[in-house]
């Protein structure tokens, strides 16, 4: 009985090995999407952007319609906003008590304020909100990580404290990076009039934290 079972197992192993050797790597996606096809599918020069240029005031008036004044009024509420600092203990609290709110609350308030200021500037287009947007961008760039404390366990070192040697892409960092990317796209010329180092720093942070990490 044991001999018969042994022979059966050997036969199954041989059958498996034979089929493994016979397996053909098809690479269907790689064959279908060669370099030329991918190149022809790419939309270069930001031609895919569906929104008006910053200087196209008529375009933004049409795009925002009756909501234009609402966006401006909302942004005005943050002209004197005091940017929140996410403290080291705010991150550590997730490991101590399991509370993620203490870190996410100031982080979320900053992101919301920055978004409101950005949309107000896009709606008005007079540069009135630029300095405060720069403040928000600077606060974001100075953060060690854009990821939420509850997701920092994805770091190789683990834990809930942000490492400056490794970046994590989660919903928090992805959402903020998306917002900062639009800010860079539309307001880089305005930033450069104030100081070119502002947009240079923002571009660097997006590259290192998101693009390099993803790639």
Kindly label every feature range from the protein language model.
Residues 18-19, 71, 179, 206:
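Generic hydrophobic/packing signal
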Residues 23-95:
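Low-complexity, Ser/Thr/Pro/Gly-enriched N-terminal "stalk/linker" regions
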Residues 93-96, 148-150:
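Generic structural "secondary-structure junction" signal
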């Amino acid at each position: 009985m044991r001999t018969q079972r042994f022979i059966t197992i050997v036969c199954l192993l041989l059958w498996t090995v034979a089929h493994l050797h016979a397996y053909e790597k098809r690479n269907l996606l790689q064959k279908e999407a060669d370099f030329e096809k991918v190149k022809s599918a790419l939309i270069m020069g930001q031609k895919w952007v569906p929104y008006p240029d910053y200087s196209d005031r008529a375009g933004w008036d049409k795009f925002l319609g009756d909501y234009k004044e609402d966006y401006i009024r909302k942004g005005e509420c943050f002209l004197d906003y005091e940017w929140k600092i996410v403290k080291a203990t705010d991150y550590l609290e997730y490991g101590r008590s399991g509370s993620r709110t203490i870190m996410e609350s100031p982080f979320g308030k900053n992101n919301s304020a920055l978004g409101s200021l950005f949309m107000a500037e896009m709606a008005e287009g007079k540069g009135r909100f630029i300095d405060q947007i720069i403040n928000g961008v600077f606060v974001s760039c100075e953060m060690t990580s854009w990821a939420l404390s509850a997701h920092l366990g994805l770091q190789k070192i683990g834990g809930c404290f942000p490492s400056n040697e490794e970046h994590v892409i989660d919903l928090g960092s992805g959402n903020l990076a998306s917002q900062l990317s639009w800010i860079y796209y539309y307001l880089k010329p305005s930033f450069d009039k104030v100081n070119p180092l502002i947009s240079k720093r923002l571009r660097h942070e997006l590259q290192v934290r998101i693009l390099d990490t993803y790639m």
